[in-house]
Amino acid sequence: MMGLATGADDMIVREMTAQENTALVSAGRLARLACASEGQPYMVPIHYAFADNYLYSFSMLGQKIDWMRSNPKVCAQIDDLTSARNWKSVVVYGVFEELADRIGTKVERDRAWSLLEKHANWWEPGSLKPVLPPVASASNHVFYRIYIESMTGRQAVEA
């Protein structure tokens, strides 16, 4: 266990276990997704659903999608903040996979749709709620998933 003393109001920061990391990611709905292009980082909030070692999400076309298409290595940060001295944070490292509307990805695309639609307002960061699962040729909507390669987590509690 790693500790950090901060004066009269001590706080302990410790590494979370793999099981604790997975529990936080599973319970979460909002992440901060980071990608990079030509050495320039870019971070945005996303709504997501977690299943089978993937984060599933949805977006409109734009900088985030363009950058992930050119460099699929990404990370996402998910947290549970109770207070400045009581929080959990997990960083997920993974690989972007676009779920285009074509033969070979329909099952994964439909799975993303079904997982995301279980959560209220999942479409808000994507700007527009589709009525039916969107068709790539008729829409600028992009379903994607992040394959999780590894996770690290920290937890802070008041001592």
Label for each model-derived stretch:
Residues 1-27:
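Extreme N-terminal tail/first-helix region
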Residues 2-5, 10, 85-159:
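Charged, gly/pro-rich active-site loop segments
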Residues 28-60, 76-77:
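Short beta-strand segments
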Residues 36, 79-81, 130-134:
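Short, solvent-exposed loop/turn elements at beta->coil junctions and helix N-caps
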Residues 61-90, 97:
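Helix-adjacent hinge/juxtasegments
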